[in-house]
Curated annotation (Swiss-Prot):
Function: Master enzyme that delivers sulfur to a number of partners involved in Fe-S cluster assembly, tRNA modification or cofactor biosynthesis. Catalyzes the removal of elemental sulfur atoms from cysteine to produce alanine. Functions as a sulfur delivery protein for Fe-S cluster synthesis onto IscU, an Fe-S scaffold assembly protein, as well as other S acceptor proteins.
Transferase found in the keyword field: yes
Residues annotated to bind pyridoxal 5'-phosphate: A75, T76, N156, Q184, S204, A205, H206, T244
InterPro entries: Aminotrans_V_dom, Aminotrans_V_PyrdxlP_BS, Cys_deSase_IscS, Cysteine_dSase, PyrdxlP-dep_Trfase, PyrdxlP-dep_Trfase_major, PyrdxlP-dep_Trfase_small
Subcellular location: Cytoplasm
List of residues that carry N6-(pyridoxal phosphate)lysine: K207
Co-factor requirement: pyridoxal 5'-phosphate
Name this protein carries in UniProt: Cysteine desulfurase IscS
Active site (record annotation): C329
Main location as per UniProt: cytoplasm
GO cellular component: L-cysteine desulfurase complex
Family designation: Belongs to the class-V pyridoxal-phosphate-dependent aminotransferase family. NifS/IscS subfamily.
Length: 405
């Protein structure tokens, strides 16, 4: 079976062969298979050494102290630990939290949970069409009892970049903790936690050619951030996250972060050319709209709405391309993307969107082929659409009164 062209790197990435090789060294009896918490013999010491080296590799990419890296099972757990951990530890200082309507579910769902525990959450509305959350919006929402602001650095559906450096200045001045979900940012944009006033940051390995099931939470040491642990049982990771450390996963994440640091800038440049080529080509079609910010973005994403085409039908027509109509965490539902709805898109436009996301194995030939098949599919589906005919005849569809069924 011929595999389709993979353009869903925002959902997950394949493990880099070099990463897989490093991981294999930590699995079998002749490798580093010991428990990093076993302090009484060489098997444990060797595993601990690998774990600590990986901690340095992750810290180096984001210019942090290795002691500020806490291993988790992924960005979802990191987000949960940051939000619930800070909220529950500092509840006596205030119960107000700020986030936005376009965060990942791994932030929004814990926020709903915290609301049930008596916290008050402000959900910021993004700028229409671009999806920007601006420092001004955050400043207007900050209060003396705001204990936490949680915003993503790069949006996972539209690729818009939030100016977290400036927002960090505002939160620090307000004595408010600032958590940033950087799952889609690491390895794509420069992160310097030695200068940014960010207190907590979530990471995932599988978004940058590392394994699934491993992530990290950066927890600032100075000024110190304290958390209420969410998983108990042994006090690993300085009491913040109990559980035997998965040496092979951790080693894989460290290696992936180191490789990302070496190739990041050249890769962004290469991918931007591919993205621009696809977007420029798609604009030959009528009624095609870019979702997200035209310039303040990372190159790996292109989210496009094709008016008068059902996104699910278009995806089914693109048999040669693996794309999505939203984040992988919500693409199992047929609801329109809540991110695109928050950008002010109509149900119709939100339903007609496709997210193309690019990565290290995407080639120019891939883009040429996907461009050809996408144009053909859109044209074919529009031929079948009575709404398209009405639009072409100059009928303003917003004024049409539809009969009730």
């Amino acid at each position: 079976m011929k595999r389709p062209i993979y353009l869903d790197y925002a959902a997950t990435t394949p493990v880099d062969p070099q990463v897989a090789e490093r991981m294999m060294e930590c699995l079998t009896f002749d490798g580093t298979f010991g428990n990093a918490a076993s302090r009484s013999h060489a098997y444990g010491w060797q595993a601990e050494e690998k774990v600590e080296y990986a901690r340095e590799q992750v810290a180096n990419l984001i210019k942090a102290d290795p002691r500020e890296i806490v291993w988790t099972s992924g960005a979802t757990e990191s987000d949960n630990l940051a939000l619930k951990g800070v909220a529950q530890f500092y509840a006596s200082k205030g119960k107000h939290i700020i986030t936005s309507k376009i965060e990942h579910k791994a932030v929004l769902d814990p926020c709903r949970e915290l609301e049930e525990q008596g916290f008050e959450i402000t959900y910021l509305e993004p700028e229409p069409q671009t999806g920007l959350i601006t420092p001004e919006m955050v400043k207007a929402a900050l209060r003396p009892d705001t204990i936490l602001v949680s915003l993503m650095m790069v949006n996972n559906e539209i690729g818009t970049v939030t100016d977290v450096a400036v927002i960090g200045e505002l939160t620090r001045a307000n004595k408010t903790f600032f958590h940033v979900d950087a799952a889609q940012a690491a390895g794509k944009v420069d992160i310097d936690l030695s200068t940014m006033k960010i207190d907590l940051m979530s990471f995932s390995a599988h978004k940058i050619y590392g394994p699934k099931g491993i992530g990290a939470l950066y927890v600032r040491r100075s000024p110190r951030v304290r958390l209420k642990a969410q998983i108990h049982g042994g006090g690993h990771e300085r009491g913040m996250r109990s559980g035997t450390l998965a040496t092979h996963q951790i080693v894989g994440m460290g290696e992936a972060f180191e490789l990302a640091g070496k190739t990041m800038h050249a890769e962004q440049e290469r991918i931007r050319k591919l993205r621009d080529k696809l977007w420029n080509g798609l604009q030959d079609l009528e009624q095609v709209f870019l979702n997200g910010h035209p310039t303040q973005n990372v190159a790996n994403y292109l989210n496009v709405s094709f008016n008068f085409v059902e996104g699910e039908s278009l995806m089914m027509s693109l048999k040669d391309a693996a794309v999505s109509s939203g984040s992988a965490c919500t693409s199992a539902t047929l609801e329109p993307s809540y991110v695109l709805r928050a950008l002010g898109l109509s149900d119709e436009l939100a339903h007609s969107s496709i997210r193309f996301s690019f990565g290290k194995y995407t080639t120019e030939e891939d883009i040429d082929h996907v461009l050809t098949i996408t144009k053909a599919a859109v044209e074919k589906l529009r031929e079948l659409s009575p709404l398209w005919d009405m639009y072409k005849e100059g009928i303003d569809l917003s004024t049409v009164e539809w009969a009730e069924h």
